[in-house]
């Protein structure tokens, strides 16, 4: 047996309420539909009446309208005076009409939804911006500018121009609020100190960079001076080699020991063997004398090296029988061993060599012209 409760349950009561609301809405909709249908029929009748009227020209219509206005049946239409300018946005017009409502909420896709309470909290959290004077002038500079009585101290050139006017009202306001909000003043002081520390660090870094650049420039100058000195030394060595009698080869740039030997190199124009023997025989026994007339030079070989050194010391740069002589020890010393007597075959080689004697021992054969003539006659 099913037991049905006498009253309705909560769900049934809620459904009944909804049903009643729907009925009321349906009745309202029907009433609105009736009103709209009646308005459309009236508009259609007006349109029909207007369409049934005869078509008139603009000139006749304007004359009829003027007569009606004069009679007072129709009032003249007043032209609206519109202010020419830029169009205002609808949101701005809404703000101007209802300033108490505040800004109309609009959908902004790239902005998080912020309520008015959150906006107020954020504005309270944000640090207040400093004035332009505070951002450039620190508190210590302001105290220096002020005198002991709180007045501006007179400095050099204070009376030359008009007095400077600073925003002291802001100072008074900040002093009044400082007692009420000490944490703000502390945060400002901390920010000032941080800014000063940053400026000091930047200045130190700049000074270090300048010192480094100066040291680099000094090192570069030193290197340049060293290179210049080296180049000068090289040039001096080259000049010395060029000025000397024989140029030193590039493969042996180091200093050489003085030459030693018994063979001399003699340079002079129009030299003769008799002149050379007469000039060089007083210093020692000459074992070889060879000449090279195309080059204006000769080679004189002594028996001893001491005599060669003495001849160089006394005859180099002198003039003998109007011939300027340049005497030096020869680079090549082929007769040194033979002259000193170290080898047995050396003396023989010197005696029989083509350079050993300046005169050829062979006899020259000379043919007369008569012999040629006789041979020609016999042939024909």
Curated annotation (Swiss-Prot):
Keyword terms of this UniProt record: ADP-ribosylation, Chromosome, Coiled coil, Isopeptide bond, Nucleus, Phosphoprotein, Repeat, Repressor, RNA-binding, Transcription, Transcription regulation, Ubl conjugation
Gene giving rise to this polypeptide: NELFE
UniProt Sequence repeat ranges: 184-185, 186-187, 188-189, 190-191, 192-193, 194-195, 196-197, 198-199, 200-201, 202-203, 204-205, 206-207, 208-209, 210-211, 212-213, 214-215, 216-217, 218-219, 220-221, 222-223, 224-225, 226-227, 228-229, 230-231, 232-233, 234-235, 236-237, 238-239, 240-241, 242-243
Residue spans of biased composition, Basic and acidic residues class: 90-101, 186-256
One annotated GO biological process: positive regulation of transcription by RNA polymerase II
The name this protein goes by in its record: Negative elongation factor E
Tissues in which the protein is found: Widely expressed. Expressed in heart, brain, lung, placenta, liver, skeletal muscle, kidney and pancreas.
Superkingdom of the organism of origin: Eukaryota
Record cross-link Glycyl lysine isopeptide (Lys-Gly) (interchain with G-Cter in SUMO1), residues: 78
Function, in words: Essential component of the NELF complex, a complex that negatively regulates the elongation of transcription by RNA polymerase II. The NELF complex, which acts via an association with the DSIF complex and causes transcriptional pausing, is counteracted by the P-TEFb kinase complex. Provides the strongest RNA binding activity of the NELF complex and may initially recruit the NELF complex to RNA. (Microbial infection) The NELF complex is involved in HIV-1 latency possibly involving recruitment of PCF11 to paused RNA polymerase II.
Compartments where found: Nucleus; Chromosome
Residue(s) carrying Phosphoserine: 51, 113, 115, 131, 139, 165, 179, 181, 185, 187, 191, 249, 251, 281, 353
């Amino acid at each position: 047996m099913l037991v049905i409760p006498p009253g309705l349950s909560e769900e049934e009561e809620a459904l009944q309420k909804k049903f009643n609301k729907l009925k009321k809405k349906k009745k309202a909709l029907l009433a609105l539909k009736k009103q709209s249908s009646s308005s459309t029929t009236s508009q259609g009748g007006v349109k029909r009446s207007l369409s049934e009227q005869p078509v008139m020209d603009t000139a006749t219509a304007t004359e009829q309208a003027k007569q009606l206005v004069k009679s007072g049946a129709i009032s003249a239409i007043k032209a609206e005076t519109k202010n020419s300018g830029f169009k205002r946005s609808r949101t701005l017009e809404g703000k101007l009409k209802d300033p108490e409502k505040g800004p109309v909420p609009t959908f902004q896709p790239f902005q998080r939804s912020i309520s008015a309470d959150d906006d107020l909290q954020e504005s309270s959290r944000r640090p207040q911006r400093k004035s332009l004077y505070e951002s450039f002038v620190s508190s210590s500079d302001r105290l220096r500018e002020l005198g002991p009585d709180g007045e501006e101290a007179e400095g050099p050139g204070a009376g030359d121009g008009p007095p400077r006017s600073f925003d002291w009202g802001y100072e008074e306001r900040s002093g009044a609020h400082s007692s009420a909000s000490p944490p703000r003043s502390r945060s400002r002081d901390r920010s000032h100190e941080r800014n000063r520390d940053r400026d000091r660090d930047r200045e130190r870094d700049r000074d270090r960079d300048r010192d480094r650049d100066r040291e680099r420039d000094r090192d570069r100058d030193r290197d340049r001076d060293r290179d210049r000195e080296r180049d000068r030394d090289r040039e001096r060595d080259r000049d010395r080699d060029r000025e000397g009698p024989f140029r030193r080869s590039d493969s042996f740039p180091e200093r050489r020991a003085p030459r030693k030997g018994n063979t001399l190199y003699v340079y002079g124009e129009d030299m003769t063997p008799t002149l050379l023997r007469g000039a060089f025989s007083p210093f020692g026994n000459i074992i070889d004398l060879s000449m090279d007339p195309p080059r204006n030079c000769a080679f004189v070989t002594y028996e001893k090296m001491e005599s060669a050194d003495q001849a160089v010391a006394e005859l180099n740069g002198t003039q003998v029988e109007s011939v300027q002589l340049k005497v030096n020890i020869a680079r090549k010393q082929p007769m040194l061993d033979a002259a000193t007597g170290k080898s047995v075959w050396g003396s023989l080689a010197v005696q029989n060599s083509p350079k050993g004697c300046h005169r050829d021992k062979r006899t020259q054969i000379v043919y007369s012209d008569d012999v040629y003539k006789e041979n020609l006659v016999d042939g024909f």
